[in-house]
Design a protein with these regions (language model features):
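N-terminal Sec/ER secretory leader and immediately downstream segment
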Residues: 1-36
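Solvent-exposed, acidic/flexible segments
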Residues: 9-12, 16, 43, 79-86, ...
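A eukaryote-biased sequence property
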Residues: 24-25, 72, 166
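Extended, well-ordered protein cores
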Residues: 40-41, 45-47, 56, 60-82, ...
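Short solvent-exposed coil/turn linkers within tandem alpha-helical repeat scaffolds
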Residues: 48-56, 96-107, 149-159
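Flexible, glycine-rich surface segments
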Residues: 68-131
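A cross-kingdom marker for long, charged
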Residues: 118-119, 131-194
């Protein structure tokens, strides 16, 4: 069955509508990415129907994941959220991890934070860090992200990590930049993209 009609604003058959309804009643939904349609968990269903059985940290975590799934992050190897959202996600995880050190999904939270920080520091294929790599000229996305982080969260752990990196880029110190990326990778703060 071809489910692409749902996302192409084409008429949808009764069979597909019924299938969609059945999925929704059971906590799932149809989604699509780069033309492929797939089934995924409907996190709003989980929060709505099971929240009375959850701890406050679990509710907060699931609401955050639901928000991130709704907003997305990247499509076709390009970041699709605004710089402020990107930074706010990193800080949300930083604070959540600090405030919930025994949370059952703590490693998952650390992994999300690590991924978001990795892409903030190194870019992603179709949202590169530099508009001109030779001149080390920031893409506007990252210039905006770093300025927002430094201004809004001056006391955050993430800001302490990012500040020397940001300064090294502004001063075009390639060796320092490479050393910091290596150091952060070894410490497990970011993923290795090489």
């Amino acid at each position: 069955t071809d489910y692409s009609a749902i996302y192409m604003n084409e008429p949808v058959s009764k069979k597909i509508k019924d299938f969609q309804t059945h999925l929704q009643k059971n906590g799932f939904k149809l989604s699509s990415s780069e033309g492929a349609v797939y089934i995924e968990q409907d996190r709003s269903f989980v929060v709505k129907n099971l929240s009375t059985m959850m701890s406050e940290p679990m509710k907060a975590y699931l609401l955050q994941i639901q928000k991130e799934n709704r907003e997305g992050f990247s499509e076709d190897a390009a970041i699709t959220i605004k710089p402020k959202q990107h930074v706010d996600r990193i800080i949300w995880y930083e604070n959540f991890i600090k405030n919930n050190p025994t949370f059952v999904l703590l490693e998952n939270c650390k992994s999300y934070k690590k991924a978001y920080l990795t892409y903030l520091l190194q870019g992603i294929d179709n949202t590169p860090l530099y508009s001109d790599a030779e001149q080390m000229t920031f893409e506007l996305y990252y210039a905006t992200s770093f300025k927002y982080l430094l201004k809004t969260y001056p006391e955050a752990e993430t800001t302490l990590l990012v500040t020397p990196y940001y300064e090294a880029i502004k001063q075009k110190q390639k060796a320092t930049i490479n050393d910091l990326i290596k150091k952060y990778t070894i410490k497990g703060l970011i993923f290795s993209l090489n």
